[in-house]
Structures are given as C-alpha cells and as structure tokens.
Amino acid sequence: MAYRGGNGGGMQNMMKQAQKIQEQMQQAEAELEEMEVLGFSGGGEEGDETVVVYMNGKKVINGIEFGSKISEMVDLSDEDDVEMLEDLLMAAINDGYKKADEEYKKKMGPFGNLGGLGGLM
C-alpha cells in the first residue's frame, strides 16, 4: 500500500490562503500609492498663512503649496524669514508623514509582519 501523505489538502489550502493574503497586501499597497495625504502648518487647515504638503500614503511628496499671505510675510533676502519658511515647510512635511503613517497602519496593520516572509509572499 502506497503512502499518500495525509495533509496534502491542508498544504494546498495554506498556499491558497497565502496567495489571497498576498493579493490583499498588493491591493492595500496600491491604495496607499493612490491616496492623497495633506500636511499643514502655519495656520491649521488650508488658510492664507498655511503651508500645505501633498503626499501619498507611501510618503512620496507630490506637491507643496504656500498660502497667499506667505509671500507677503517672507522676504527671501532675510535669513530669519527664510528660517521661518523652512520651519513651516518641515512642520507641514512632518504633519503629512504622521498622517501617512496612520493611513499605512490602517491599511497594512491587518497583515502584521507577513511582509517579512520574503520569497514566500
């Protein structure tokens, strides 16, 4: 009598489940790339004195916008004004990064550490 390996169906089901999880992870990654996250500084939500940084959920910056009053407030020949503008820009980027991290955790959190499976996924 030949041995038939009693758990062949279990392994096949496990591979199907792994493939399904991989597809879900890829979908979540694609959603992060398409998502728009806004980082603000200098006046809260999109005001005249606000710096806005546009990025996707994977922290790729797609644009930067300065409110209309920023140009009136900043003299690029004045070191203090340039430093203020740099600080506003960094604050907006960091705000966007924080929001992107939150979105990443929402999308990828259910997968735990599965991304570390290397070639298996």
Name each model feature, range by range.
Residues 18, 59, 89:
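Residue-level signature of catalytic and energy-coupling elements of molecular machines
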Residues 68-72:
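A short acidic/small-residue loop/turn micro-motif
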Residues 88, 92-100:
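Stable alpha-helical structural segments in soluble proteins, enriched in small hydrophobic residues
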Residues 1-43, 98-121:
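Long amphipathic alpha-helical segments used for membrane anchoring, targeting, substrate engagement
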Residues 8-9, 15, 74-90:
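Ordered, soluble secondary-structure elements with a strong preference for glycine-centered loop motifs
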Residues 45-63:
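N-terminal intrinsically disordered, cationic/polar leader segments
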